[in-house]
């Protein structure tokens, strides 16, 4: 079973991935996790990160160029994802294809039914062959709370300076709205929307009931 955890920067995705992994293991399931972008492992991801911190000229100003870099990062992990899915009962991804659709649409002031989201779906799923997730879980929190967490994370870790996307509060708000639309229309497969107070054990049981094989 392939599960993608989605949400704006600072939503708490990493924490949810850790807690959900623990819940699945407690239920007797084997679990693997993978986070995107794969900074430090993927040239495409590293170039994107550098662009979001002011390098590479005007690269970051191009929505489609940045989206392509993030897509190529995931494309480079296709075989890794497939291997994990064969070797484990549950594979949990911290961000996946929907993040590209949400941020790209938000940057262009489009909604989930716009050209950017449709393009991401064609490029990543159809052209690059990314496997579709069995579930996409949207961790829906307020933009204010996400912003506070993002700022706090940067203060605690001097090496984790916020990038251009993370510093743009209006972009984060628009991205959250697009995410909600993607979930409502079932973009790319099944969605489940949860809040910051979600119980990991109950979430695991909903995503993969104990009597249903992964």
Curated annotation (Swiss-Prot):
It comes from Mycobacterium tuberculosis (strain ATCC 25618 / H37Rv). The keyword Ion transport does not apply. This is Thymidylate kinase. The keyword Magnesium applies. PROSITE patterns: THYMIDYLATE_KINASE. Was identified as a high-confidence drug target. Its cofactor is Mg(2+). Gene3D superfamilies: P-loop containing nucleotide triphosphate hydrolases (3.40.50.300). Highly thermostable. Is half-inactivated at 65 degrees Celsius. Catalyzes the reversible phosphorylation of deoxythymidine monophosphate (dTMP) to deoxythymidine diphosphate (dTDP), using ATP as its preferred phosphoryl donor. Situated at the junction of both de novo and salvage pathways of deoxythymidine triphosphate (dTTP) synthesis, is essential for DNA synthesis and cellular growth. Has a broad specificity for nucleoside triphosphates, being highly active with ATP or dATP as phosphate donors, and less active with ITP, GTP, CTP and UTP. DTMP binds at residues 9, 39, 70, 74, 95, 100, 103, 163, 165. GO terms for molecular function: ATP binding; dTMP kinase activity; GTP binding; magnesium ion binding; protein homodimerization activity. One of its GO terms (cellular component) is cytoplasm. The LID domain is a solvent-exposed domain that closes over the site of phosphoryl transfer upon ATP binding. It comes from the Bacteria. Optimum pH is 7.5-8.5. Inactive below pH 4.6. Competitively inhibited at the phosphate acceptor site by 3'-azido-3'-deoxythymidine monophosphate (AZT-MP) (in contrast to other TMPKs such as E.coli, in which it is a good substrate). Inhibition seems to result from the impossibility of magnesium binding. Mg(2+) binds at residues 9, 166. CDD domains: TMPK. Its EC number is 2.7.4.9. It catalyses: dTMP + ATP = dTDP + ADP. One of its GO terms (biological process) is dUDP biosynthetic process. PANTHER family: THYMIDYLATE KINASE, UMP-CMP KINASE 2, MITOCHONDRIAL. Residues 147-159 are annotated as: LID. ATP binds at residues 7-14.
